[in-house]
Amino acid sequence: MPPTYNKAFIPLESNPEVFNELISLLGAPPSLQFEDIFTLDDPALLPDKILALVLIFPTTPTFEARLTAEEAGAQDWMVEHNEEDEDAMWFKQTINNACGLYAILHALANGRAKDFLRPGSLLDNLLSITAPMDPAQAAMALEASTELENAYSSIAIKGETAAPSSAEDEVDFHYISFVKSPDTGHLYELDGDRKGPVDRGVPDEEQRVDLGQKSLDVVRQFIAQGGDNIGFSLMALVEKA
């Protein structure tokens, strides 16, 4: 059964320049930037410090079938909310076509990235408000934030492709994030359309802070499960010198 939403936004273009404009408004400094990743197979072409990955992919029948099967067994992978010991900050998506926004929020709210946020910035304040809340309350707080909606709307109309005529128009692409807990080394797949954060284990024992090669292998496996579809694209949130 497809998710139901309470409101709708114009979709965000998968463009690093657009993403970087938005994260600047949210409170990220210039030292945090998104950039395109064109290959996962050549380490020489990958950034040194990957704080998060955002994967954009088509919502094909193959993906929908796999999602349904995994959701049926959610008790095997879902991380329960624990206010006292939260290893991954996850937001339930309640805004249609805003998966790009949720991917950005997940990338910035987890791992080392959250330590870069400007104190008192839009996202820093939202994270302070939502941290003690359960997922349903946190989702409603994001949905009700006029400041967040205004920042997003000012950027979503930009990009190289024309925005849909209506925010309610459905799009066939979805965004998810992969982040690392610096405390435990666990890799999390964060998708606002799922029942909770997906714990993908500790792939990088030797690199427990940022995403290392074995974390990238998990993303490769996700892409491979899409079969012959070539509609995937990938962006990395990186720390610049």
Which stretches of residues belong to each language-model region?
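Cysteine-dependent deubiquitinase/ubiquitin-like isopeptidase catalytic cores across multiple families
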Residues: 1-241
